[in-house]
Amino acid sequence: FIFGWAPTVDGDVLPVQPFDPQAPAQSKGIPVMIGTTLHEFTMSTYVPAFRTITKEKAVEFLQKKYGERTDEFLTAFEKAYPGYQPKDLVDVDFVFRPGAVEQAKLKAAQQGAPVYMYMFAWESPVLDGMFRSTHCMDIPFAFNNVVRHASMTGGGAEAQALGEKMSSAWLNFARTGNPNAEGLPEWEPYTAEKGATMIFNNDCQVKYNHDKELLEVVMAFPTRGF
């Protein structure tokens, strides 16, 4: 666990190990909403050379990890994210997303209360777009604080419009267990078969198992983390 801080099962406050390979029966009837940002730790934010990286250089970087499966990775990446920029090859998150998908699958397999999956893909314009869809970028939108946190979001009209939609979804989920909200397409519960994921962006849309093949390639390699 990051930095050595870890939950401790005490039978009271934390009755079940949160990293158990099975979803706890205790919460079977409680709806869940889970998601990640597209870029999370956004390598190009911290490595300036990656901001203008060419596809050829990005492929060289990927070959160090994926070796002979690099072409397979690239094919799956193109399918998941058509029209991507070369820096997306190093920026798209594979630390949080696989675990979130696994958790959603375990919850859905209980066949109890629904689980809703999202991916936040809106890119901040701040500092010439350096942050992209970085870690925690979704939080000001969920709480509709995009103007208050303009140093992170830019506070512009597009950010405000998305903040209205996302905060409505979060409020509806808190009130009813269903995040569907005005201005958003129908948000279906997640299942392993369909993999419905709400993509939050200026044009919000639901995609189905859009990165399934890509994650299968990524998960074939044991090195995960940062």
Where are these regions (language model features)?
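Short, flexible active-site recognition loops that position polar ligands and cofactors
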Residues: 155-156, 160, 208
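A structural signal for short secondary-structure junctions
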Residues: 134, 164, 190-192
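Tryptophan-rich aromatic "cage" segments
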Residues: 203-226
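Substrate-gating cap/lid region and adjacent catalytic-acid/histidine neighborhood
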Residues: 1-157, 169, 176
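Non-catalytic, well-ordered alpha-helical segments in soluble enzyme domains
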Residues: 159-182
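Mature extracytoplasmic/periplasmic domains
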Residues: 171, 180-207
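Short, solvent-exposed polar/charged micro-motifs at secondary-structure junctions
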Residues: 126-130, 195-197, 208-210
